Swiss-Prot record:
EC nos: 2.1.2.10
Oligomer and partners: The glycine cleavage system is composed of four proteins: P, T, L and H.
Keywords: Aminotransferase, Transferase
Native species: Bacillus subtilis (strain 168)
The protein's name: Aminomethyltransferase
């Protein structure tokens, strides 16, 4: 039996087509992926992201515990601020990438990938020491994302909270949004400005409908996982299971900014990640643009002069560029912009070149 979010019953009303996404029955699209993608780039889109996991970490030793688990410097946070980070294994491979919200003194909300909830919880509990409480709140919290250049104007119609004053990665807790309480943060996974709204599961349907109504005049439409994927891909935001895995480090995946290897506290993977940060990693995530016809898909092998140099992690026809492009993890010596490589597509070698990323920047 596939898991469902609190908004499942609304999908059909908006024409949602569902798929199995890591054990969840979620909408891949409502209208078309291209239309939804373009709405987010030019106006606004509304996503149900309630499958994501939310875990509260509290207690007097919560900061030292998080510093040991996270690659970023959690001590830099203050209440009302969020941070993007990764958790790594001792060998530098990635457990997960996540957001940490500091809600108060010794109170943090961790937002983790849906497919990793059980694994992440087990990893955290295994390494918890001292006064640390780990509370999985995933079933009680729903998550909606309003993304796009019109997101701010839309939300201003629904809340008295000063959403326009929020800087990226800042949030307002216990904000009133159309009569319901929610945490509103200026974060997202699309490469656009936008907000993520964490509310009680019971309030999700009410808030969804209010956002749809308020957004109608601005061109907001409901969006599915398909557009979420093409949007994050163009912005070179990694997806766990593709750009980040047990065998790929945050440095290799291009999120070295979330690795503070000089922070005082020791953390899992520190020696490997420090070495990669100081001297460069052997592999690098690069952009590929096809020279010849074909789309570079996840898992396709990349060659140079007949030698395998890596694999495509994500690829598609970019709705914004109208070109067939991909992200690929390849040997660093073949990662220079302009380098010509071959992608194996249906047993044929097809020419591509290494290009600048991200493919899209607002």
């Amino acid at each position: 039996m596939l898991k469902r979010t609190p908004l499942f019953d609304l999908y059909k009303e908006y024409g949602g087509k569902t798929i199995d996404f890591g054990g969840w029955e979620l909408p891949v699209q409502f209208s078309s992926i291209k239309k939804e993608h373009e709405a987010v780039r030019t106006a606004a889109g509304l996503f149900d992201v309630s499958h994501m996991g939310e875990v509260e970490v509290s207690g007097n030793d919560s900061l030292s515990f998080l510093q040991r688990l996270m690659t970023n410097d959690v001590s830099a946070l203050t209440p009302g601020r969020a941070q993007y980070t990764a958790m790594c294994y001792p060998d530098g491979g990635t457990v997960d990438d996540l957001l940490i919200y500091q809600k108060g003194e010794n109170r943090y909300l961790l937002v983790i990938n849906a497919s990793n909830i059980d694994k992440d919880l087990a990893w955290m509990k295994e390494h918890a020491a001292g006064d640390v409480q780990i509370d999985n709140q995933s079933d009680q919290i729903a998550l909606l994302a309003v993304q796009g250049p019109k997101a701010e104007a839309i939300l201003k119609n629904l809340t008295d909270a000063d959403v326009s004053a929020l800087k990226p990665f800042a949030f307002i807790d216990e904000a009133d949004i159309s009569g319901r309480k929610a945490l509103i943060s200026r974060t997202g996974y699309t490469g656009e400005d936008g907000y993520e709204i964490y509310c009680r599961s019971d309030d999700a349907m009410h808030i969804w409908k209010k956002i749809i109504d308020a957004g109608d005049a601005y061109g907001l439409i409901p969006c599915g996982l398909g557009a979420r994927d093409t949007l994050r891909f163009e912005a070179k935001l990694p997806l766990y299971g593709q750009e980040l895995t047990r065998d790929i480090t945050p440095i290799e995946a291009g999120i070295g900014f979330a690795v503070k290897h000089k922070k005082e506290s020791d953390f899992f993977g520190k020696s490997v990640l420090s070495e990669q940060k100081e001297n460069g990693a052997k592999r690098k995530l690069v952009g590929l643009e096809m020279i010849e016809k074909g789309i570079p898909r996840h898992g396709y092998e990349v060659f140079q002069n007949g030698k395998s140099v890596g694999k495509v992690t994500t690829g598609t026809q970019s709705p914004t560029l109208g070109k067939n492009v991909g992200l690929a993890l390849i040997d660093s010596e073949t990662s220079e912009i302009g380098t010509v490589v071959d992608v194996e597509i249906r047993k044929k070698l097809v020419k591509a070149k290494v290009v600048k990323t991200p493919f899209y920047k607002r």
